[in-house]
């Protein structure tokens, strides 16, 4: 006698198949959506990484978008030279040429009345003369003793180009701009058939209370550390070494119960600045116990160990570390490719598809 299914049984089987199919599709959809949280102390390069994602995965900045950054380029340039001139007074550094004192006074007058997004030839001339001065250069060489944008020399060395009336910022100029991130900046892009949602969170202490809203369902955290911060203090607390602050923050993120199953990717950033700085500023400023040489390889490896040793779940949790230069598009492209492969593997495991 044949075994036939009743209409009710057939419907139940179909329902079961549909549920299985939906679960499978949901699993695949979850595997394809990646929520990336960019964390790290202030000025560690998080926003630059976000800009690189736009350049690498979204055809970069249009000419109109680049034009909008002209205001920021000029503001960063003017604020940088002003910061150096002010520091000269504090550090008791004299101008190489007495005539530059008049230029300094003129700088404050012209900067105060400058139209937004305009660099007059008079203002550009004053800044150029000041930047060439021996005393100003001596003060710039001591920039670890005060707060100065990383991009200061990049813009000041290129004043002839950026002060042209028809100047339009390049992609690299845009990458170098510094605007403090307040709140949460969200970026979406697709790469390797994954849909990325990247969240850039302000790194200053006052911004950190906003992070909590981003924690749910995070696939991976990219934690940015500025290697070159080892001899600097915080903008918001001049008693606190920036590297120590980063370590404290990484400890709290890496060992947080929220992130037990979250991939942690460590970007040891600004490797280019670190490579230059380590030749003249010893690592013992930050790590008095350090006995190695002040070479890039040895000092960078030591910092890497300091961070990775903070991981209290080494047996179950791996830290994926990369040395980066956030302003170098090729480097970021290469690193992000490797990061994505790790995310794909871990994400598929989570969904039971690997």
Curated annotation (Swiss-Prot):
Covalently lipidated residues (N-myristoyl glycine) read: 2
SMART domains annotated for this entry?
G_alpha
Membrane topology term? Lipid-anchor
Q: What is its main location?
A: cytoplasm
Q: Which residues form the G-alpha domain?
A: 32-354
Q: What does this protein do?
A: Heterotrimeric guanine nucleotide-binding proteins (G proteins) function as transducers downstream of G protein-coupled receptors (GPCRs) in numerous signaling cascades. The alpha chain contains the guanine nucleotide binding site and alternates between an active, GTP-bound state and an inactive, GDP-bound state. Signaling by an activated GPCR promotes GDP release and GTP binding. The alpha subunit has a low GTPase activity that converts bound GTP to GDP, thereby terminating the signal. Both GDP release and GTP hydrolysis are modulated by numerous regulatory proteins.
Which superkingdom heads the taxonomic lineage of this protein's source? Answer: Eukaryota
Annotated region G1 motif: the residues are 35-48
Question: Where is this chain lipid-modified, annotation S-palmitoyl cysteine?
Answer: 3
Q: Which residues bind Mg(2+)?
A: 47, 181
**Where is the region G3 motif?**
196-205
One GO CC annotation, please?
cytoplasm
What residues form the membrane-spanning segments? Answer: none
One Pfam family cited in the UniProt record for this chain: G-alpha
Q: For binding GTP, which residues are annotated in this chain's numbering?
A: 42-48, 150-151, 175-181, 201, 203, 269-270, 272-273, 325-327
Segment forming the signal sequence: none
Q: Quick one: a GO biological-process term for this protein?
A: GTP metabolic process
Keyword Mitochondrion belongs to the record? no
Q: Where in the cell is it found?
A: Cytoplasm; Cell membrane; Cytoplasm, Cytoskeleton, Microtubule organizing center, Centrosome
Q: How does it assemble?
A: Heterotrimeric G proteins are composed of 3 units; alpha, beta and gamma. The alpha subunit contains the guanine nucleotide binding site. GTP binding causes dissociation of the heterotrimer, liberating the individual subunits so that they can interact with downstream effector proteins. Forms a complex with CCDC88A/GIV and EGFR which leads to enhanced EGFR signaling and triggering of cell migration; ligand stimulation is required for recruitment of GNAI3 to the complex. Interacts (inactive GDP-bound form) with CCDC88A/GIV (via GBA motif); the interaction leads to activation of GNAI3.
Q: What is this protein called?
A: Guanine nucleotide-binding protein G(i) subunit alpha-3
The gene designation is GNAI3
């Amino acid at each position: 006698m044949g075994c036939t299914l009743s209409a009710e049984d057939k419907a139940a089987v179909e329902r079961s198949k549909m549920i299985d199919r939906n679960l499978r599709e949901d699993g695949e959809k979850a595997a394809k959506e990646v929520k990336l949280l960019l964390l790290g102390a202030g000025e560690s390069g998080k926003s630059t990484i976000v800009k690189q994602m736009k350049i690498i995965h979204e055809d970069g900045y249009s000419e109109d978008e680049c034009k909008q950054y002209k205001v920021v380029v000029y503001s960063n340039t003017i604020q940088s030279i002003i910061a150096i001139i002010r520091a000269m007074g504090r550090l008791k550094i004299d101008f190489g040429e007495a005539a530059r004192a008049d230029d300094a006074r003129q700088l404050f007058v012209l900067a105060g009345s400058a139209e937004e997004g305009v660099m007059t030839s008079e203002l550009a001339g004053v800044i150029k003369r000041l930047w060439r001065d021996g005393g100003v250069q001596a003060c710039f060489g001591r920039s670890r003793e005060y707060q100065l944008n990383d991009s200061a020399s990049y813009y000041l060395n290129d004043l002839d180009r950026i002060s042209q009336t028809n100047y339009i910022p390049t992609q690299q100029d845009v990458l170098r701009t510094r605007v403090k991130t307040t709140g949460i900046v969200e970026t979406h892009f697709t790469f390797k058939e994954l849909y990325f949602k990247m969240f850039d969170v302000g790194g200053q202490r006052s911004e950190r209370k906003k992070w909590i809203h981003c924690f749910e369902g995070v696939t991976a955290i990219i934690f940015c550390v500025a290697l070159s911060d080892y001899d600097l203090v915080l903008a918001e607390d001049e008693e606190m070494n920036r590297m120590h602050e980063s370590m404290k923050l990484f400890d709290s993120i890496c060992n947080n119960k929220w992130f037990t199953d979250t991939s942690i990717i460590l970007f040891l950033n600004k490797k280019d600045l670190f490579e230059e700085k380590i030749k003249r500023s010893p690592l013992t400023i930050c790590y008095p116990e350090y006995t190695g040489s002040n070479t890039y390889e040895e000092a960078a490896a030591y910092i890497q160990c300091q961070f990775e040793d903070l991981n209290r779940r080494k047996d179950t949790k791996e830290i994926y570390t990369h040395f980066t230069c956030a302003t170098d598009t090729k480097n970021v492209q290469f690193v992000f490719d490797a990061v994505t492969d790790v995310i794909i593997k871990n994400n598929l495991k989570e969904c039971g598809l690997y």
